[in-house]
Structures are given as structure tokens and as C-alpha cells.
Amino acid sequence: MKTKYTIREIETEKEMFSIFPLLIQLNPTLKKPDYKIMLKDMLRHGYRMVGVFHGKQCVGLSGFWISTKIYSGKYVELDNVVIDTKFRSKGIGKLLCDWIHAEAKRLGCKTAMLDAYEENKRGHKFYLREGYILRGFHFLKRL
């Protein structure tokens, strides 16, 4: 019997904060107070979030932004795609990406992009399988 999942946008700050235990599976050093501050700031800049649910449990999520860059035109950026460790390799990542890509197309985006941590080899394989290409390097400098 195939497991049934539902996918929907997570729209309230309260619900976005409630998924913190799932979010730290990808970002284990993130602290709740810091997340709360960052989330408020991100929401002011157009941040949105979508989740995949097994019953009432959020088992996968991704944030995303819509913006425009000179080299890409209007684009969607996937941010912190996280699948619960107990639910990986069950098609949840594809559900998230397909939903976000459809929403981005609806909003006139021509490109999807994302960053994946260098050590996230499984994620790299997944994104390549989904048609993403390696386009460059993402540099980070702490200020």
C-alpha cells in the first residue's frame, strides 16, 4: 500500500516555528532564538515555506524565495530542503521540488536555483537527478 502524503504551504510564523525539530536535522547548530529572529527577517523579505505531511507530521519542508538576478532573470531559490531522516528516499524531495517549480512557473520564474552544503552528497545526487546543473561556486565570508 502506497503511503499518502499531503503537500501544502506553511503560512503562519507559528507553524514555521513549530517545524524547528525537522529543520535542525539539516542545521544541527541552529538555536531556537536565532531561528525566530531570522524567520521574522526572512518573512519581511518574501520568504515562503512548503511542507509535506504524513498525517499531521511534517516529514519534509523547503523554504523558497522569488527574486531576480541579471544572469538568471526571475527565479525561485529553494532554501533549506529538509526531509526527515525516517522518510528519506520515499519521493518526498521530488514532491517538494515539483510543487515549488509549479508555483515558480505560475509566478513567471524562468529558473530554479539552490545551494547544497558541500558535505551533502545525497542531496547533490538528488538535485542532479532532478535536472539541476552545477553552475558555479557559492562563497561565504563571515563578517
At which residue positions do the language-model features occur?
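Conserved N-terminal entry element of GNAT/NAT acetyltransferase domains
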Residues: 1-13
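Glycine-rich phosphate/pyrophosphate-binding loop shared by adenosine-nucleotide-utilizing enzymes
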Residues: 5, 56-61, 76
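A short helix-loop-beta-strand connector motif used in the catalytic cores of GNAT acetyltransferases and
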Residues: 40-51, 77
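Conserved beta-strand in the GNAT
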Residues: 51, 57-66, 82
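A conserved beta-turn-beta hairpin within the catalytic core of GNAT-like acetyltransferases
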Residues: 67-78, 88, 134-135
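Conserved acetyl-CoA-binding loop-helix of GNAT-fold acetyltransferases
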Residues: 83, 89-102, 129
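Conserved active-site alpha-helix within GNAT-family acetyltransferase domains
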Residues: 94, 106, 118-136, 141
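Conserved GNAT acetyl-CoA-binding A-motif
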Residues: 97, 104-115
